[in-house]
From Swiss-Prot:
Its EC number is 7.1.1.-. It is an enzyme of class 7 (translocase). GO terms for cellular component: plasma membrane. It comes from Legionella pneumophila subsp. pneumophila (strain Philadelphia 1 / ATCC 33152 / DSM 7513). NDH-1 is composed of 14 different subunits. Subunits NuoB, C, D, E, F, and G constitute the peripheral sector of the complex. The keyword Membrane applies. It is found in: Cell inner membrane. One of its GO terms (molecular function) is quinone binding. This is NADH-quinone oxidoreductase subunit C. Keywords: Cell inner membrane, Cell membrane, Membrane, NAD, Quinone, Translocase, Transport, Ubiquinone. The keyword Cell inner membrane applies. NDH-1 shuttles electrons from NADH, via FMN and iron-sulfur (Fe-S) centers, to quinones in the respiratory chain. The immediate electron acceptor for the enzyme in this species is believed to be ubiquinone. Couples the redox reaction to proton translocation (for every two electrons transferred, four hydrogen ions are translocated across the cytoplasmic membrane), and thus conserves the redox energy in a proton gradient.
Amino acid sequence: MTKNEYLIEKLQADLANHITELTSAYGEVTIECEVQNLLPVMIELRDREEFSFDQLIDLCGVDYLHYGDYDWETESATEHGFSRGVERQEAKAYAVNKPRFAVVYHLLSTKKNHRLRVKLFVEESHLIVPSVHHLWKSANWFEREAYDLYGILFDGHPDLRRLLTDYGFIGHPFRKDFPLSGEVEMRYDAKLQKVIYAPVDIVPRIVVPKVIRNDNRYIGNEGSKND
């Protein structure tokens, strides 16, 4: 039995009532849970001997607003630069019948030497998730970053302030509906002799079409999905 098979067996036995989905692909195990079950699940994952996830190595937000929309599709290899699109696409490549936003946690057990991805989807109308700062101190800046870039609130965080954007920044720049050129630009006004903020005068346009292609590293090696 591999480490992942052992982990999956224990997850199904101990957390079946708290997780909504469990998948294994490309040597990585992922579970999904509801927002209200996040803290019970995380406590079990940290404290149970068979899991022993003592480190939170990453936490991020995801916006699925335009997920599956694409301009071109190609089977060309991904390791040798971009290629021309071969066929104009009109329909979605993938459909996600879940809320727009998700929070993803990556856990590591230094004792058991295994990893786990935990994902939960959050309703756009109620972007509030319990903080896990009291379980892993590394969550502090991770949660601040997710708040800054996506607008996801973490209930119970000790200091939920923006981390990367400027003072007075409006909006959340990693959201898919945030314009690539931004909302405002900063420049020095020689007449006023000071730095001012003004609306951007760049016209938004697509210079590189959105491409969805299979990763050639896994083509012909589908058996590795369940390792």
